[in-house]
Amino acid sequence: MKVRPSVRRICEKCRVIRRHGRVMVICPANPKHKQRQG
């Protein structure tokens, strides 16, 4: 899980979602693409 000031999709499979007021990127294809805005 990377924590960065601005999150963006790295590949086509990445999905930008909102959980508990936080913007996150989840990726079923490549778990290394997981990010959270912080």
UniProtKB/Swiss-Prot annotation:
Q: Which UniProt keywords apply?
A: Ribonucleoprotein, Ribosomal protein
Q: Tell me, what is one Gene Ontology molecular-function annotation carried by this entry?
A: structural constituent of ribosome
Q: What is this protein called?
A: Large ribosomal subunit protein bL36
Q: Is the Ribonucleoprotein keyword given for this protein?
A: yes
- What highest taxon heads this organism's lineage? Bacteria
The organism named in the record is Synechococcus sp. (strain JA-3-3Ab)
Q: Which family does it belong to?
A: Belongs to the bacterial ribosomal protein bL36 family.
One Gene Ontology CC term in the entry: cytoplasm
What's a BP term from Gene Ontology annotated to this protein? translation
Keyword check for Ribonucleoprotein, yes or no. yes
Q: Which InterPro entries match?
A: Ribosomal_bL36, Ribosomal_bL36_sp
Entries under SUPFAM superfamilies matching the protein: Ribosomal protein L36
The residues forming the signal peptide are: none
Q: Where are the transmembrane segments?
A: none
